[in-house]
Amino acid sequence: MTNMGAIRAALYRRRWLLSRRVVQMFIVLAFLVDWPEVGRIAHGNLSSSLWLGVLPLTDPFIALQSLFSGTMLAKTALVGTVIVAGFYFLFGGRIYCSWVCPINMVTDLAYWLRQKLNLKGNMTMSRELRMAVLGMSLILTVLSGTLAWENFNPITLFQRELMWTSVAGSMVLLSLFLFDLLITRRGWCGHLCPVGAFYAVLGRYGRLRVTAEQSGSCAGCGSCIRVCPEPHVLAPVVSLKANTVTHGDCTRCGACLDQCATGALAMKLDLGKSFRGIPIVRK
């Protein structure tokens, strides 16, 4: 294989990861850079923004907190909420976590370094803990009459750090990085983040799904599960109990597709009848 062929092969094996990074960096830069002939593409932040001066986008979790705090949404914010909620409801809520959220780049870096350093420490934590954090954040919102979670939200602090060099933002990002690196694998996104918990519920029946229609080519190596940030979502597919990942925790990150050397997995948009996984047998 030529050097160029080797490069192409290496890029193809990371096609989903590279695609996500391009999208994430574009979104970050859209809020920061004045583009030629266009100017600033997005004004605001990931909580509520206006794109190209015409398209309002509002985080549904922010909208929910606003309602719980007793604040009525402005018409533009309501329209933005419907647009964003509709998108994630159709395609899968946790697409936000792997394709939009900038914190994902921080936690992915921690995971990569953890693997390179062969760090074994992994504190046991229930994945349901993030649902408890979600519930607590809404309770605090009701009691305080404010968007309580936004005082601690790493996503908000990340954008403040980029725009105004916030010391608090730097400390939170460093803490999350060290937590994921030293304490537990995928600790923040996989066990604690209430935003991810909210989007998992919102996009439970999203139609963009990982499928194993070529299950006969599966080598049974388990490499897809090892790289998956939410490995429990792949268990029914790998054990051949279903040919489609239907769990709301799936982030559609494509890590399993990048890792699968046999092409047994694919990402497909299913617009047919709702299903929870069609039983299959090994060929």
From Swiss-Prot:
Residues 208-239, 241-270 form the 4Fe-4S ferredoxin-type domain. [4Fe-4S] cluster 2 binds at C228, C250, C253, C256. Signal peptide: none annotated. Gene3D superfamilies: 3.30.70.20. GO terms for molecular function: 4 iron, 4 sulfur cluster binding; metal ion binding. The keyword Translocase does not apply. Keywords: 4Fe-4S, Electron transport, Iron, Iron-sulfur, Metal-binding, Repeat, Transport. PROSITE patterns: 4FE4S_FER_1, 4FE4S_FER_2. Pathway: One-carbon metabolism; methylamine degradation. [4Fe-4S] cluster 1 binds at C218, C221, C224, C260. One of its GO terms (cellular component) is plasma membrane. PANTHER family: FERREDOXIN-TYPE PROTEIN NAPH. Involved in electron transfer. This is Methylamine utilization ferredoxin-type protein MauN. It comes from Methylobacillus flagellatus (strain ATCC 51484 / DSM 6875 / VKM B-1610 / KT). The gene is mauN.
